[in-house]
Amino acid sequence: CSCADMTDKECLYFCHQDVIW
């Protein structure tokens, strides 16, 4: 996935959750 703001911890958190699951 990709986050509009790569410094957005919440976005990155859910992004990585999606990768894991």
From Swiss-Prot:
Give the family this protein belongs to, as stated in its UniProt record: Belongs to the endothelin/sarafotoxin family.
Name this protein carries in UniProt: Bibrotoxin
In terms of one coarse class, where is the protein primarily found?
secreted
Q: Where, per UniProt, does this protein localize?
A: Secreted
Q: What does this protein do?
A: Vasoconstrictor activity. These toxins cause cardiac arrest probably as a result of coronary vasospasm. May act by displaying agonistic activities towards endothelin-1 and -2 receptors (EDNRA and EDNRB).
Question: Per its UniProt entry, which superkingdom is the organism in?
Answer: Eukaryota
The record's GO molecular-function terms, alphabetically, read: toxin activity
Look up the record and give one Gene Ontology term from the biological process aspect.
regulation of vasoconstriction
Cysteines paired by S-S bonds: C1-C15, C3-C11
Q: Which GO terms describe its cellular component?
A: extracellular region
Q: Does the keyword 4Fe-4S apply?
A: no
Task: Give UniProt keywords alphabetically.
Answer: Cardiotoxin, Disulfide bond, G-protein coupled receptor impairing toxin, Secreted, Toxin, Vasoactive, Vasoconstrictor
> Which is an annotated Pfam family here?
Endothelin
Task: Give the organism, scientific name.
Answer: Atractaspis bibronii (Bibron's mole viper)
Asked whether the UniProt record includes Disulfide bond among its keywords, one would answer: yes
Site positions (Endothelin-receptor binding site) = W21
Q: In which tissues is it expressed?
A: Expressed by the venom gland.
Identify the InterPro entries for this entry: Endothelin_toxin_CS, Endothln-like_toxin
